[in-house]
């Protein structure tokens, strides 16, 4: 049997932009994507700490060390600049894979600069 578990989390990132007229997605600083091992165009869940909104979208790789967290398209209605978000990715694992499973938890400062990785 396969089960779905958290594979990575970007904890308490700050929204730097919202782009309603963009096709969709969430642009994320490339350094943060690499730290979390989240790929470009990978499905993510976003949890807005400020207003409780939760939604699904996908990633676009932003410029490294830019601090960018831009929520785009229809999802831009669910977020304001300055909102604090949790961005999560999930994976499907076999029982064997779960024996060595550890999620990557990434923490940032108030400028979205990586400060800590726990795994």
From Swiss-Prot:
GO cellular component, one term: cytosol
Active-site residues (renumbered): 25, 58
Origin superkingdom: Bacteria
Locations listed in the record: Cytoplasm
Gene Ontology process terms (BP): alanine biosynthetic process; pantothenate biosynthetic process
Pfam families, per the entry: Asp_decarbox
EC number: 4.1.1.11
Top-level class of the enzyme under EC nomenclature: lyase
Location of Pyruvic acid (Ser) modifications: 25
Keyword 4Fe-4S: no
Keyword Chaperone recorded: no
Post-translational modification: Is synthesized initially as an inactive proenzyme, which is activated by self-cleavage at a specific serine bond to produce a beta-subunit with a hydroxyl group at its C-terminus and an alpha-subunit with a pyruvoyl group at its N-terminus.
Cofactor: record remark: Binds 1 pyruvoyl group covalently per subunit.
Cofactors that this protein relies on: pyruvate
Catalytic activity: L-aspartate + H(+) = beta-alanine + CO2
UniProtKB keywords: Autocatalytic cleavage, Cytoplasm, Decarboxylase, Lyase, Pantothenate biosynthesis, Pyruvate, Schiff base, Zymogen
Pathway note: Cofactor biosynthesis; (R)-pantothenate biosynthesis; beta-alanine from L-aspartate: step 1/1
UniProt-annotated binding residues for substrate: 57, 73-75
GO MF annotation list: aspartate 1-decarboxylase activity
Family annotation (HAMAP family): PanD
Family: Belongs to the PanD family.
Subunit structure of this chain's protein: Heterooctamer of four alpha and four beta subunits.
Annotated function: Catalyzes the pyruvoyl-dependent decarboxylation of aspartate to produce beta-alanine.
Protein name: Aspartate 1-decarboxylase
Organism: Ruthia magnifica subsp. Calyptogena magnifica
